[in-house]
Amino acid sequence: MAYAIIETGGKQLRVEPGRFYDVERLPIEPEGTIDLEQVLLVQTDSQVHVGQPYVSGAVVSGTVMEHRRGPKVIVYKMRPKKKTRRKKGHRQELTRIMINEIRLNGESLGG
């Protein structure tokens, strides 16, 4: 099974064709396609291609499924004996993408 390690949103992610992943919000409408060219590593059935920093000629293509929000994270700050309390919540904006295929030098490795 071929897989790739990509960089998106300042994070590294191991992706495989046919699976979906939640990444940082991307400025692409749902049902739109995306080509991720910041590929750090590509693993085929017989070889490993490691980039320095990126693998040249490697592209991971996918489809934007939907935009969503992550789970709520509560931040609570309190100073004892002072009646000072601060409660904040945060939900991260995410984009769910379906990985269609991994291409290396124009040749499809999966999908």
Curated annotation (Swiss-Prot):
Protein name stated in the entry: Large ribosomal subunit protein bL21
Gene Ontology CC terms: cytoplasm; ribonucleoprotein complex; ribosome
Keyword Signal recorded: no
Purpose: This protein binds to 23S rRNA in the presence of protein L20.
Domain of life from the UniProt record: Bacteria
GO terms of biological process kind: translation
This protein's UniProt keywords: Ribonucleoprotein, Ribosomal protein, RNA-binding, rRNA-binding
Protein family per UniProt: Belongs to the bacterial ribosomal protein bL21 family.
Subunit annotation: Part of the 50S ribosomal subunit. Contacts protein L20.
Gene Ontology MF annotations: rRNA binding; structural constituent of ribosome
